[in-house]
């Protein structure tokens, strides 16, 4: 019956929280809430972070690309993991948001890879498959080969930790997503 809010004067950075709702006399599972913007591993708990610390250098001056004519737009659809995971991609941050920030990468055959390859093709816009926090990849077991396109959302407002270099730190996934 509406939206409930609460405010706390203290800076509780580094703390986590969940909500638990009782519906028709039954307690439902704990949830980080639909408006969570930062979460812990696997999105089970909302995190309180200082979002200013997630801004990469120059973030406040970042501008979107200018589009002259829609006819000049060349779009490439991609998945974070697929784009960079190959063992000969020459990309350091394979399967991560940061893979899309690496320049000068080459395959073992000397061919351009990553962003440089897209530029070489004339691509000027990228459509990235779901980046939000989703259920099917266990962020605490990234050494295990897991894969999903991300169409099983958990937290729509939070980048998925499996694409970050540290899924245990809620701020890292946000900062690396912004860097991308």
Locate each region found by the language model.
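Conserved, mostly hydrophobic/aromatic
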Residues: 19, 78, 118, 128, ...
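Carboxylate/His-rich catalytic cores and anion/metal-binding grooves
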Residues: 118-145
